[in-house]
Amino acid sequence: MVDDKDLKIPEHVAIILDGNGRWARAKGMPRSYGHVKGCDNLEKISDVAIEIGIKYLTVYAFSTENWKRSKEEINGLMKLFRQYLKKCKKMADKNHMRITVLGDPTAFDEDIQESIREVQEYSAQYNEHFFQIALNYGSRDEIKRAVNKIADDVRAGKITGEISEDIIASYLDTAGLPDPDLLIRTSGEQRLSNYLLWQLAYTEFVFTDVAWPDFHREELMDAIRQYNHRDRRYGGVK
């Protein structure tokens, strides 16, 4: 058994933050309570990730499909996003962390879009740690947007010759980031839900029954322990 101090820490961890609403319902509370607690936990886990040596953390906070939820729940989530984005500059300073929002921000109200721009511009000064938050993100939408941009640049003569994987990757929301080494999904579901479909080609998956608000340092370390028992061959043979 590998001692925790000897664990290989994945450089890039992606997390699907799932189970806030069900966690709250199980406690007899409204779904909004779960989202608040889940948001609080995100700040804590981002600190833990940096503490243990994870350089890149990418979290799935709001998908393109989540707009189908009730108006009341959507309004509550927008309020949370506004509050969280206001904290992000202090988080960036504390952890020397660059914060990037993945997805299409144009669906949000202008004040949220402006907060996203401000956080990204402000935190661009840091390159020690990288925190990506997927908001109004769907991988198929990301790929569609990338293909349209590539087509525009081909027509403009900016791209000639064959379209390589590297070219496609450079047009994705995650351009410049390494692919995730480890994906964690909380709350027992075992599916990708349209998350980072291009980027997860050789990523190791860990699914946990623990809901996101209860996912703390020990649960993260347990996922990393499981990761350390995987043999990553990238399609080859060892």
Regions found by a protein language model. Name each.
Residues M1-K238:
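Flexible, compositionally biased loop and terminal segments
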